[in-house]
């Protein structure tokens, strides 16, 4: 079973994504800030990580850099309301960029692109 982590300071987005991921067969959890995400990423490995770029206690970019010191293989999907960040996010090595707001269909399509779903 693939493991997924959602990192976003909006609890509603975390709950929605975790619910959808669990329904699709993932073991999924979430963190609401950089501090808790750093602790989680330092002690656990994940196959898929959703990261918001603008978190209450830090930058999603810093978090991505921190993650890459531990894990170079996890797929990272940036979810952000700032469409202008797409190119920068892709340049730092994320797998996909999804603008907010997004739909369940958008998430499902992203998981297909990254080969997490077969159907």
Label the model's feature ranges.
Residues 102-112:
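C-terminal output helix
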Residues 52:
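Active-site residues of response regulator receiver
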Residues 61-72:
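Short amphipathic alpha-helix used as the core "switch/output" element in two-component signaling
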Residues 62, 82-98, 108:
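Alpha4 helix (beta4-alpha4-beta5 surface) of REC/receiver domains from two-component response regulators
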Residues 30-48:
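Acidic, metal-coordinating helix/loop segments flanking the phosphotransfer/catalytic sites
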Residues 77-79:
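Hydrophobic/aromatic residues positioned on beta-strands within the core alpha/beta folds
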Residues 11-29:
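Two-component/phosphorelay signaling modules centered on CheY-like receiver
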Residues 33, 59-62:
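Acidic catalytic/metal-coordinating carboxylates
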